Regions:
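N-terminal intrinsically disordered/low-complexity leader segments
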Residues: 1-7
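Helix-turn-helix
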Residues: 11, 15, 19-53, 57
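Hydrophobic alpha-helical connector segments
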Residues: 57, 71-104, 156-163
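Amphipathic alpha-helical packing segments from all-alpha helical-bundle domains
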Residues: 67, 85-88, 120-146, 158
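All-alpha amphipathic helical-bundle segments outside canonical DNA-binding/catalytic cores
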Residues: 124-129, 146-162, 180-181, 185
């Protein structure tokens, strides 16, 4: 008879996500993970496989929760009714998150810096997250163009790539400074392309 699980898998995964997000992959030991997750090594390996597989699961969890750009943009668009305001809210959320999360940055961006370009399946997951961010921004920009919020001279695919790159750069900058006024200045200058 199989022994029942003695822990909440989702809660353990959330805890692992926070450890990896704070420390990165290389600096996180299995001991760090079992202590944070409140489980033993055998349970970790049985439930998640190895450290690499657990990292992939934690990164996916981040993308579906904290780092859900599509959801954040959709909610901001519904709340404000303005594509430009929704994009601004996304950028300002990155500034606010930096201050509220001990300057951890974005787990996806941190992973890109730690692993890429030769990161195999982890790199593929990072690339997918970046494409999803770009696609979400592209969709909002198309709505902005259709509603007349931005002009016809704007190329939505190119602008979505630019905004994705700028958002990721902002997330890196937010790790290096506690000067939120400077970060807001970066947002203002970046988003001036929408005017």
């Amino acid at each position: 008879m199989a022994r029942p699980k003695e822990f909440d898998r989702d809660q353990a995964l959330d805890r692992a996500m926070h450890v990896f997000w704070s420390r990165g992959f290389e600096a996180t030991s299995i001991q760090d993970l079992v202590e944070a997750m409140g489980i033993n090594r055998g349970s970790l390996y049985a439930a998640f496989g190895d450290k690499h597989a657990l990292y992939l699961a934690a990164l996916d969890r981040f993308c579906c929760t904290v780092g859900d750009v599509e959801g954040a943009l959709g909610a901001a668009l519904r709340d404000s009714g303005s594509a430009k305001a929704a994009i601004r809210r996304l950028f300002m959320a990155a500034v606010e998150a930096a201050a509220n999360l001990d300057r951890r940055g974005c787990m996806v961006v941190n992973t890109a810096v730690e692993f890429c370009p030769d990161a195999g399946d982890i790199g593929a997951q990072v690339a997918l997250a970046m494409r999803r961010t770009e696609a979400a921004l592209h969709g909002v920009l198309l709505q902005a163009r259709a509603s007349g919020e931005i002009g016809d001279r704007v190329d939505p695919p190119a602008l979505a790539r630019y905004l994705t790159s700028s958002l990721n750069g902002l997330r890196v900058m937010a790790k290096t400074t506690d000067d939120n006024a400077a970060l807001r200045d970066i947002v203002d200058v970046t988003l001036s392309v929408l005017d």
